[in-house]
């Protein structure tokens, strides 16, 4: 075979697929000349009789950008042409190739349907038995005849040739432009992926569709005939290719990521099995359900004797009735439109025997109700084993019980989103750089939804930068018309209650806690018991999403919903009024519209003009108000804000239906007498002026949350005495509250009570709230006595109180998980039965300066993970095997840390900063990952070996690949101690190298340490004075045994330095160079994050893996290599690196090391003296 030139190019722009005997010496020769003149590279098979082996041809197809398939009258006689076409269509479906059909003296429909003269050439004279016939048929059916060029439409061959060349140029320009756009937006893509925006789609993988609107019906010719003319919809947005009157070709965008989606669907359907499979394709509006179903159908329909794609079943049912669906399905499957099929609900029974004869492949698109499925499928007993059924729907919950499996179509990934958007926004034109940068706003807003990406692309196409910037400002305010039309159809299918809750979430409760939202909307109609399920229904319809325990909504849905709610203000839309925009609220109040239609008001008082005040009867006629929030978006934590209510007249709140009342800085002493909290779920009055909630006691049967925080005048809580279902009560900062009422015992559901900074509270009287699980009394500075008010407490916070001890009953809190007594400076002892708290995981005693011991029975705590004893006088800690983190900082009583510390078998973190009398550090547990003895200025010696049981070079499962040991400002360390630290560092580096080699770890391992000193350890075989090191590596320095790099820097901190506040890092930039290439990268050696001055010089040692070297192949391993290392500090301008060192860490075989360990003296081996 030969190419179009003597030297084969690396790739071809055009592969020409044709029947040689028909065209080679005529049309093809002229085409080749025209392509050459146009500078277009192409591939033509010049062999008269092609080889049986088509591998080379297939490779050429894979290397091409465009396949030019020229169909002539004798084309179907050539099995080589047909095999090429099969390969071409495979590449087209993968989105890796574009096909340009040319019909040369043959009709496009004959090619697609394999009939007429073309069909005779394919099937005639016994050829129908050829084994590849099914593949050829499928490929021919897939040829997009609409985008083809037909010789019959041109005056002569030259005119056709000119059009082919022109069309190829346009397509190549699009490919080049798309590539440039992708490259220029690559940074945006990386930013999007790095931020990992919580998208609406439950899945985060790529999106398979070529269509941006899966809610429109298909336009395939074979199915258009099945739909009455009046019901046919327009073509999809820029996805159906057409031939203009002038013959120009407009190509559709490629099927981005379609193959992985098809593969997942094919796995679910298992086409090779004899089992009947029913699979639902679901997802939010515009995500590509229909496109995926269409593509799947077109690929597999020829494998079944009976098949049908039923477009837009929901719309067909609305226009023609339910029974029409069944009739149309049966007529298509039985291939007889003259059958006398009635309009009963189960006509399948009359045709059952015939239907059971053959397997079927059915794709039912856009089903919206169970009734539609039941009408279409009846009892399901007419479907032959091995049949495959696919149903697409926007309602996943509706499909349950009908399908055995569902596939949720995921959103587009970042790269495909970029390409999809730019394909529509720029077309064949080059994207302007300033517009490319603005694209990220639309990409972030669309979050991979192809409907939104395509719609915005079309809207912006041809517009200038000013138009783009203007649209960005209105993204969240005004819906795109195309998006709006699709979403409006979905909205209209909801029940009235679903519509209300959908709008409530969008306008008021987006991103709120799921349980909270469910409870608030659950009580929208007190007589209804079904409201709890409305959020679940909306989730099943992909109109809301539960992510991280919160109710989320895609931005396009939220904008649509808010726009719909805003229209209710000026139009008779039968939608309740939801007001959150200050201007809308003012307009509504000034025009005195129907107050009883208001459902919710969220008023940001910081937006209200200073000169405006509100009358006390503003809410008097809002009898249906359910949600009221008055707040300030610029209000500081202390509640400073501008609120402009006329406080002369008492407010009137005759709101019987209110569910949510949030009023920041409520200015009156109590809620008015006409306020009825019978339906109240959440009461929020932070920073208010109330002295009591309301007059007397009122029934609050469904109140679950009450927040009265920082209501500094509050003294009386009796008004909430009947809140039997109250779960959370926040009284933080209520500085006038002296005590809790005895009637709180009626709060049978209370689980959370926050009384932080209730500085007038002196004691907790003997009340019992057995349901309470979390009690916060932090910074109740006058609280001297604590009584156990619930034996079911799980978290107890007494930090900052004046208590001197815990009552004996505290030992009976067997469910307690967290006990925080930080800063209890009067605390002298702990209960002897503290060890009975078997569930305790965190014990915080920081700053308890009088505490000298802990009970010995704490060793029996099997779940204690965190023990903070900093600022205490405790000298010894009982051995707690479960302990993972221990803090003993600022302990002035401890001189020698206990010898049995190495037995703390799960200890990962040990912090002993500023223990000014500590002199000795024993052997540390082998599992320890982090040690910090910063500022232990009297520390003199450490045990040798520093870490216990270092008898092997191989890490066991208790050890981690990342560890840090810091001895900063430990200026009295003996030289032996420094040597022990250095030797441990060498040993750790060797161990990590072995582990990285054994487990084939290329990244993630890291170790660093620092200690006072000015000498680079001798085991660094490359050393230099200053901050630059340039060792020369001999040939073959890089081999499979290389696992890591050890680096050392001696940092000098000047005596006149400013105190170092915050953090600084020691880094090294490495550049490997030889005659054939270079590689540059940065490594971290260590960092410090301690306030104060670093005194004297310090040695920093770090180990990093060779991942950058292993990932880079431009440095040939057999050449000598020079390494330039530049050591430097960040955020420590008055300090500098004065000496440095470097060592490559190699590993050996496991057997050799074990033999050395067995035969060598351990001490000598450990010290690295062999």
From Swiss-Prot:
Q: What's the domain remark here? A: The TIR domain mediates NAD(+) hydrolase (NADase) activity. Self-association of TIR domains is required for NADase activity.
Briefly state the protein's biological role: TIR-NB-LRR receptor-like protein that may play a role in plant innate immunity. May trigger hypersensitive programmed cell death in response to pathogen attack. Involved in tolerance to tobacco ringspot virus (TRSV).
Task: Specify where the region named Disordered lies, as residue ranges.
Answer: 193-219
Q: Which UniProt keywords apply?
A: ATP-binding, Hydrolase, Leucine-rich repeat, NAD, Nucleotide-binding, Plant defense, Repeat
Q: Which organism is it from?
A: Arabidopsis thaliana
Please list the residue ranges annotated as the NB-ARC domain. Answer: 261-513
Q: Compositional bias (Polar residues) at which positions?
A: 198-219
Give its E.C. classification number: 3.2.2.6
> Does the UniProt entry include the keyword NAD?
yes
The observed outcome of changing residue 811 to E is: In laz5-D3; dominant negative mutation responsible for suppression of the acd11-dependent autoimmune response
- Give the enzyme class: hydrolase
Any one biological process term the GO annotation gives: signal transduction
List the GO molecular function terms: ADP binding; ATP binding; NAD+ nucleosidase activity, cyclic ADP-ribose generating
Xref: PROSITE patterns: TIR (PS50104)
Could you confirm whether the keyword Hydrolase appears in this record? yes
Additional record remark:
Plants over-expressing LAZ5 exhibit hypersensitive cell death and do not survive. In the ecotype Estland (Est), which shows a sensitive response upon tobacco ringspot virus (TRSV) inoculation, the TTR1 allele is involved in the development of lethal systemic necrosis in response to TRSV.
**Taxonomy of the source species:** Eukaryota, Viridiplantae, Streptophyta, Embryophyta, Tracheophyta
Question: What is the name listed in the Swiss-Prot or TrEMBL entry for this protein?
Answer: Disease resistance protein LAZ5
Q: Could you tell me the superkingdom of the organism this chain comes from? A: Eukaryota
């Amino acid at each position: 075979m030969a190419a179009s030139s003597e030297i084969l190019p690396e790739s071809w722009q055009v592969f020409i697929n044709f029947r040689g005997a028909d065209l080679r010496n005529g049309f093809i020769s002229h085409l080749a000349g025209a392509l050459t003149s146009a500078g277009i590279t192409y591939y033509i098979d010049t062999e008269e009789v092609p080889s049986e082996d088509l591998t080379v041809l297939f490779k050429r197809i894979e290397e091409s950008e465009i396949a030019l398939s020229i169909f002539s009258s004798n084309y179907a006689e050539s099995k080589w042409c047909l095999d090429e076409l099969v390969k071409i269509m495979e590449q087209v479906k993968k989105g890796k190739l574009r096909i340009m059909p040319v019909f040369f003296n043959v009709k496009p429909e004959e090619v697609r349907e394999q009939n007429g003269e073309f069909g005779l050439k394919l099937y005639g004279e016994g050829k129908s038995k050829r084994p590849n016939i099914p593949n050829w048929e499928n490929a021919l059916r897939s040829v997009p005849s609409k985008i083809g060029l037909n010789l019959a439409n041109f005056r002569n061959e030259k005119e056709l040739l000119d059009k082919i060349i022109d069309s190829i140029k346009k397509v190549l320009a699009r490919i080049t432009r798309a590539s440039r756009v992708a490259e220029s937006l690559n940074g945006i893509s990386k930013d999007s992926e790095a931020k990992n925006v919580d998208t609406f789609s439950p899945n985060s993988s790529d999106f398979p569709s070529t269509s941006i609107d899966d809610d429109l019906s298909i336009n395939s010719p074979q199915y258009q005939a099945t739909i009455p003319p009046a019901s046919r919809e327009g073509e999809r947005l820029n996805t159906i290719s057409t031939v203009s009157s002038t013959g120009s070709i407009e190509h559709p965008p490629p099927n981005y990521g379609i193959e992985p989606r098809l593969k997942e669907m094919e796995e679910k359907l298992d086409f090779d099995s004899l089992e009947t499979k029913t699979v639902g394709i679901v997802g939010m509006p515009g995500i590509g359900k229909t496109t995926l179903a269409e593509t799947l159908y077109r690929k597999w329909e020829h494998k079944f004797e009976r098949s049908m794609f039923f477009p837009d079943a929901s719309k067909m049912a609305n226009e023609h009735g339910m029974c029409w669906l069944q009739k149309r399905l049966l007529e298509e499957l039985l291939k007889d439109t003259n059958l006398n099929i009635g309009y009963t609900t189960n006509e399948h029974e009359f045709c059952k025997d015939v239907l059971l004869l053959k397997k079927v492949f059915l794709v039912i698109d856009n089903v919206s109700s169970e009734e539609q499925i039941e009408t279409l499928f009846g009892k399901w007993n007419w479907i032959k084993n091995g049949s495959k059924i696919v149903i697409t729907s926007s309602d996943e919950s509706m499909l349950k019980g009908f399908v055995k499996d569902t596939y949720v179509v995921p959103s587009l990934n970042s790269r495909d989103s970029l390409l999809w958007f730019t394909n529509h926004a720029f077309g064949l034109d080059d994207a302007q750089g300033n517009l490319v940068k603005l694209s990220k706003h639309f990409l972030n807003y669309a979050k991979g939804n192809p409907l939104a990406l395509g719609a915005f692309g079309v809207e912006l196409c041809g517009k200038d930068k000013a138009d783009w910037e203007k649209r960005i400002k209105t993204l969240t305010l005004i819906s795109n018309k195309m998006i709006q039309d699709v979403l409006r159809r979905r909205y209209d299918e909801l029940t009235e209650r679903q519509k209300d809750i959908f709008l409530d979430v969008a306008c008021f409760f987006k991103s709120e806690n799921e349980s909270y939202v469910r409870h608030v909307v659950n009580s929208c109609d007190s007589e209804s018991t079904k409201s709890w399920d409305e959020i679940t229904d909306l989730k099943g319809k992909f109109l809301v999403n539960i992510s991280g325990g919160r109710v989320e909504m895609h931005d396009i849905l939220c904008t649509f919903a808010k726009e719909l709610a805003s229209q209710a203000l000026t139009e008779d839309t039968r939608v309740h009024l939801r007001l959150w925009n200050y201007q809308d609220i003012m307009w509504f109040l000034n025009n005195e519209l129907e107050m009883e239609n208001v459902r919710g008001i969220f008023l940001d008082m910081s937006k209200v003009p200073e000169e405006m005040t509100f009358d006390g009867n503003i809410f008097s006629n809002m009898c249906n108000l359910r949600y009221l929030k008055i707040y300030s978006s610029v209000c500081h934590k202390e509640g400073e804000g501008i609120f402009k209510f006329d406080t002369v007249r008492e407010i009137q709140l005759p709101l019987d239906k209110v569910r949510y009342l949030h009023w920041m800085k409520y200015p009156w002493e109590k809620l008015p007498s006409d306020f009825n909290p019978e339906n109240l779920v959440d009461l929020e009055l932070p920073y208010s002026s109330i002295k009591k909630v309301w007059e007397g006691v009122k029934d609050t049967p469904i109140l679950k949350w009450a927040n009265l925080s920082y209501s500094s005048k509050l003294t009386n809580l009796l008004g909430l005495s009947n809140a039997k279902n109250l779960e959370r009560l926040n009284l933080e900062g209520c500085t006038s509250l002296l005590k809790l009422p005895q009637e709180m015992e009626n709060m049978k559901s209370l689980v959370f009570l926050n009384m932080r900074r209730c500085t007038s509270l002196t004691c907790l009287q003997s009340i019992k709230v057995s349901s309470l699980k979390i009690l916060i009394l932090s910074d109740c500075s006058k609280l001297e006595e604590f009584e156990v008010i619930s034996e079911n407490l799980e978290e107890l916070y007494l930090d900052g109180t004046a208590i001197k001890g815990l009552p004996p009953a505290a030992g009976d809190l067997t469910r307690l998980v967290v006990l925080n007594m930080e800063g209890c400076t009067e605390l002298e002892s702990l209960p002897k039965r503290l060890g009975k708290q078997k569930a305790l995981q965190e014990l915080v005693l920081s700053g308890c300066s009088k505490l000298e011991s802990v009970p010995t029975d704490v060793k029996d705590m099997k779940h204690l993970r965190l023990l903070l004893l900093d600022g205490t006088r405790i000298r010894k800690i009982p051995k707690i095997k479960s302990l993972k983190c221990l803090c003993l900082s600022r302990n002035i009583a401890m001189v020698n840390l206990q010898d049995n510390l190495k037995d703390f078998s799960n200890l990962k973190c040990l912090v002993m900063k500023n223990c000014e009398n500590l002199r000795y550090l024993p052997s540390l547990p082998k599992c320890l990952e982090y040690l910090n003895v910063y500022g232990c200025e009297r520390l003199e010696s450490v045990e040798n070996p520093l870490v216990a049981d270092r008898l092997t070079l191989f890490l066991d499962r208790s050890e981690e690949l990342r560890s840090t040991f810091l001895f900063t400002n430990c200026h009295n360390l003996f030289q032996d101690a420094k040597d022990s630290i250095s030797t441990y560092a060498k040993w750790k580096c060797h161990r990590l190298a072995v582990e990285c080699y054994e487990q084939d770890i290329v990244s993630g391992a890291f170790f660093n340490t620092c200690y006072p000193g000015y000498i680079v350890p001798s085991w660094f075989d490359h050393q230099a004075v200053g901050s630059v090191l340039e060792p020369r590596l001999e040939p073959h320095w890089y081999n499979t045994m290389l696992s890591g790099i050890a680096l050392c820097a001696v940092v000098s901190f000047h005596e006149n330095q400013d105190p170092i506040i915050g953090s600084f890092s020691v880094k090294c930039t490495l550049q490997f160079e030889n005659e054939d290439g270079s590689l540059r990268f940065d490594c971290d050696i260590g960092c410090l994050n301690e306030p104060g001055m670093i005194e004297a010089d310090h040695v920093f040692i770090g180990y990093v893996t060779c991942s950058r070297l292993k990932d880079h192949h431009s440095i040939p391993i057999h050449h000598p290599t020079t390494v330039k290392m530049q050591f430097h500090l960040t955020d420590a301008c008055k300090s500098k690196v004065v000496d440095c060192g470097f060592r490559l860490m190699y590993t050996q075989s496991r057997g050799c090391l074990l033999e050395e360990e067995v035969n060598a003296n351990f001490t000598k081996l450990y010290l690295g003296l062999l």
